[in-house]
């Protein structure tokens, strides 16, 4: 691969500079670079599992359209090499935080992979304005009890946003009777699922015709589960030392105003960067807590940053 890389890098300037002349490389000559001795470049389809499930519900792989949908997501995700490696590293640090809340709320641990599909375990913002680890729109976030203002955005709070997502999913499950359709509604909204049930007379995610994004959505979570449960089967060889370790954190409860978060950090033998890393819900350099609300701030232990 290295030899091919440097050969192409050398040839590309010639192609660009001589584009209007007679000495340009033909398509056949360019593609023949891959056939030289010692050069190997293979892209193969990822393996499709014989069985799959999500949240305890079997994926009907006996249907060709279901197999093809899952294979599409497996193929897409496994070829995001760097992104997927980083997600698997982050999972070592944050999976426990998410699964603890899922267990407390009575939800299947597979919903961790829905969080992966939503945000790649990062404090993301979508073009549509959905934010945080679970990608809530502001209106839905407030409906499920999350605080959003110029100083606090609990969509970026691991625990609170996960609990809000659990509330939504349990409400949707009570309405639809399957976790996969509840998960689909998390992407498109219950009103849109209701419309499709009305005119399709279908209450099964795998049988329902849906917009492309939602049609792919649950399959994406299933694909993440499949790959991350057995990464070596998909060509990803991470050593134990490659995975990010959970950071030892202490809980500090704040029911007062904070004039400057950096001063707060210094009092706890850390800095604002470390405070923000584990409390992305902090959206300002201060907190006007005039109603004395009780916030939980995660503070790294004194020697946590130096851990090996």
Which residues fall in each region the model found?
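Short, functionally critical alpha-helical segments immediately adjacent to catalytic or ligand/cofactor-binding
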Residues: 107-122, 182-188, 275-278
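Primarily a LysM-type cell-wall glycan-binding module
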Residues: 239-269, 293
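Substrate-binding/active-site groove segments that recognize
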Residues: 129-150, 162-164, 169, 193-196
